[in-house]
Amino acid sequence: MVELNPVTITNDNATPRGHVLKLILVESRDIIRAVKTRLCPQYTISYLAQAATVIAMLDTYSSKSELSKPDFFVALTVVNGRRYLREDLESNYLAGYVTGAPIKIEKLRSLLVSLDDSKDIIVSALEKAAKDAKRRLDMWIYDQSQLATGFRIHSFKGAMSSENPELFKKTAVPYLSSYGINEV
C-alpha cells in the first residue's frame, strides 16, 4: 500500500485548502496498473482520483439523508488538450490546450460509503464514480470544439468574479488537477 503524506496549502486571500500528493514513479505505476487492470486499459489515474474526491466529499456531507436517487455532483477538472489537437490546429488554438471540463457524477446516494464498509463496497463505489467521470471527460476530450468552449467559460467566470467578487464568495468546489504526464 502506498503511504501518502498530503501537504495542506492555504492562501490568505481566499483560504482554499489543497492537498499536494507527490508520488514516486513506482507508486504512480502501481496505481495506474491497478486502475487499468480493475476497470480497463482506457481508464487513467485521473478518473480514479476524481471518483475518490467525490466519495471523500460525500463522506463529510452532513445531510446524507437528504440525498435522493437522482441527485448528482458537478465539478470542473483540468484537461490537458495538447495531445488531442490535430497538428495543423496546434499553433492556432493555444487557449484550448489546458482548459476545464465539467465532470458529472450521478446517483450520489449509491456512492455513500464509510471506511467501516467492506473493501468490495468501497471499490464498487469508486468504480461507478470513475466510470461516470470517464464518460463525461471523454465527451470533452474527444470533441475538440469542447476544449475551446471550456476556456471561454473560464474566461467569462473570471471576468465576472473580478467585476463582482461577492458573487462567488460562498461557492466551494473540490478541484482536481492532473497535468496528464502520469497518464501516458
Swiss-Prot record:
MF annotations from Gene Ontology: acetyltransferase activity
What is this enzyme's class at the first EC digit?
transferase
The answer to whether the entry has keyword Acyltransferase is yes
Q: What is its EC number?
A: 2.3.1.-
Coiled-coil blocks? none
Q: In which pathway does it act?
A: Mycotoxin biosynthesis
Q: Which UniProt keywords apply?
A: Acyltransferase, Transferase
General function of this protein: Trichothecene 15-O-acetyltransferase; part of the satratoxin SC2 cluster involved in the biosynthesis of satratoxins, trichothecene mycotoxins that are associated with human food poisonings. Satratoxins are suggested to be made by products of multiple gene clusters (SC1, SC2 and SC3) that encode 21 proteins in all, including polyketide synthases, acetyltransferases, and other enzymes expected to modify the trichothecene skeleton. SC1 encodes 10 proteins, SAT1 to SAT10.
Name by which UniProt lists this protein: Trichothecene 15-O-acetyltransferase SAT16
Give the species this sequence originates from. Answer: Stachybotrys chartarum (strain CBS 109288 / IBT 7711)
Source taxonomy: Eukaryota, Fungi, Dikarya, Ascomycota, Pezizomycotina
